Curated annotation (Swiss-Prot):
Highest rank taxon of the organism: Bacteria
CDD domains found in the cross-reference section: MLTF-like (cd13403), PBP2_YfhD_N (cd01009)
Annotated keywords: Cell outer membrane, Cell wall biogenesis/degradation, Lyase, Membrane, Signal
Cellular-component GO terms for this entry: cell outer membrane
Protein name: Membrane-bound lytic murein transglycosylase F
Presence of keyword Membrane: yes
Signal peptide annotation: 1-18
Matching InterPro entries: Lysozyme-like_dom_sf (IPR023346), MltF (IPR023703), Solute-binding_3/MltF_N (IPR001638), Transglyc_AS (IPR000189), Transglycosylase_SLT_dom_1 (IPR008258)
Pfam families per the UniProt record, alphabetical: SBP_bac_3, SLT
Subcellular localization: Cell outer membrane
TM annotation in the entry: none
Broad enzyme group: lyase
Length: 492
């Protein structure tokens, strides 16, 4: 009887232990599933990010843009809910918002960080990057952390602090400052402007800033390449995480991620210091003269794109002439000028108007099967090498097993139009397809530089105005206190 009683006690204890173990797990699962349910109930996905040229920014037209924005928008559409973006200044703010349930996902080209795994879940990887130490071109290049001769700054919220603590054992004189106010982009710009000596930043952020600050130079990689992820709230496997996994798999299979990456940073690998520096100088000194014309004749295009085309064609020189006879700002052939009914190809207004109209016409010639946001790249290739050769490139792509409606597939085959084994079987024959390839890539790079140049300029203007307003308010407060003191003295 006593043995039976002990067995009953043991069974009850085991059941209580099982309940104690399972119940919290169920609570965790229910909590995280409630987050997914809450997203559906509120009809809105809230994503936190950091404002920069790659992840998220508001362009000159007031529209949201960026890789993380477009990917987040696609995920929100997948969930059939609206999207709300909350822009943070740094990683600390971002992860704090995630921890405190102010956002559902943190998405800002965030590298895999083992020190975050106790607090957060990571989504599937969709990119890779490394930490790089950067310095200002024209100053002495350090070869290691032990050769730094000045101030080193990092943005808050990353694994860098822990990494640098380890490095300090090797380099005892290593000192750094964690900046809790500035974004990585702002830190890089300050370094380029001589306010900071060194910065460690994500290689993606570095490549983006180099398009507007070409004196940002990479000294060395601090780490090897690591995977990039979205971060989700803590807890176990959840319905939200499962949905994200399904979405990412679909985005990879359909080419969505490849198209978004192509749009925002695949062309950044072509960075050229001399060309970028000359281009930015032209943006400052030449573009303001012609910007109103690009705006006037943009039609359905972004005026920055039209300006980028003109720079690629003539470096904004209205009198430009090539050995083949093309002339003017948009480097029009005589036949195209006659077709567009313009009299003087060297007149900048006539040239820009005709170039825009011709490009709009080329866009209408693209098959409806090509996605709306990719039609412009096909049209630009046709603008450069002719519509017939572009059609040949699409046919060749199809014959090689690619998708003729996918710009990524077609552009990699453009150089083949100059190879005899391929062009002999094409309707329009030989073409310098490699030139068309670089033509489109350059225009995309030039356009991004214009967009972000004006974005940074506007941010600096707003910062200056805020500073001036604060100074005026401070002066008024001092004056008010002085007047009060004077009144008190007079009364006495």
């Amino acid at each position: 009887m006593k043995g039976l009683f002990l067995r009953i006690i043991a069974i009850v204890a085991l059941l209580l232990w099982a309940i104690d173990m399972v119940f919290p797990w169920q609570q965790i699962m229910r909590s995280e599933e409630n987050r997914y349910t809450a997203i559906q109930s509120r009809g809105k996905l809230v994503v936190g990010t950091i404002n920069n040229p790659i992840s998220y920014f508001i362009d000159h037209a007031g529209q949201a843009a960026g890789l993380e924005y477009e990917l987040s928008k696609a995920f929100a559409d997948y969930l059939n809910v609206d999207l709300e973006i909350l822009a943070m200044s740094n990683g600390d703010e971002l992860f704090s918002a995630l921890k405190n349930n102010k956002i559902d996902i943190a998405a800002a080209n965030l590298l895999y960080q083992p020190n975050k795994l106790d607090m957060f879940q990571v989504g599937p990887t969709y990119n890779s990057a490394s930490w790089q130490l950067v310095y200002r071109k024209g100053t002495e290049r350090p070869r290691s952390l032990g050769e730094l001769k000045g101030s080193l700054s990092i943005a808050s919220g990353s694994e860098l602090t822990e990494l640098l603590k380890v490095e300090k054992e090797k380099y005892p004189d290593l000192i750094w400052r964690v900046n809790e106010k500035l974004t990585p982009e702002e830190l890089l710009i300050q370094m380029a402007d001589g306010k900071i000596d060194y910065v460690i930043a994500n290689s993606i952020d570095v490549s983006a800033v180099q398009q507007i600050k070409p004196n940002v130079a990479v000294a060395f990689d601090v780490t090897d390449e690591s995977t990039v992820h979205w971060y989700l709230p803590s807890n176990s496997y959840s319905e939200l995480q499962a949905s994200l996994l399904d979405f990412m798999n679909s985005a990879i299979e359909t080419g969505l991620i490849a198209r978004i990456e192509e749009k925002y940073f695949n062309h950044l690998a072509q960075f050229d210091y001399v060309d970028t520096r000359s281009y930015l100088r032209a943006i400052e000194t030449v573009l303001p003269k012609f910007a109103p014309l690009f705006e006037k004749y943009k039609g359905d295009l972004d005026w920055c794109l039209l300006a980028a085309i003109a720079y690629q064609e003539s470096h904004w020189n209205p009198d430009a002439t090539s050995p083949t006879g093309v002339r003017g700002m948009m480097m029009l052939t005589k036949a195209t000028a006659e077709r567009m009914r313009i009299q003087d190809r060297t007149d900048p207004e006539q040239s820009i108007k005709a170039g825009s109209e011709y490009l709009h016409w080329l866009i209408t010639q693209m098959p409806d099967t090509i996605k709306e946001d990719e039609r412009i790249w096909f049209a630009l290739a046709a603008y450069n090498m002719g519509l017939g050769h572009l059609l040949d490139a699409r046919r060749l792509t199809k014959s090689l097993g690619g998708d003729p409606d996918n710009w990524l597939d077609v552009k990699k085959n453009l150089p083949l139009l100059a190879e005899k084994r391929y062009y002999t079987g094409l309707k329009y024959g030989y073409a310098r397809g490699y030139e068309a390839y670089h033509y489109v890539e350059n225009i995309r790079r030039y356009m991004n530089s214009i967009v972000h140049y004006y974005r940074v300029q506007q941010a600096q203007i707003e910062e200056t105005l805020d500073t001036q307003a604060a100074e005026i308010e401070n002066i008024n407060e001092i004056k008010k206190e002085t007047d009060t003191l004077a009144t008190t003295v007079t009364t006495q």
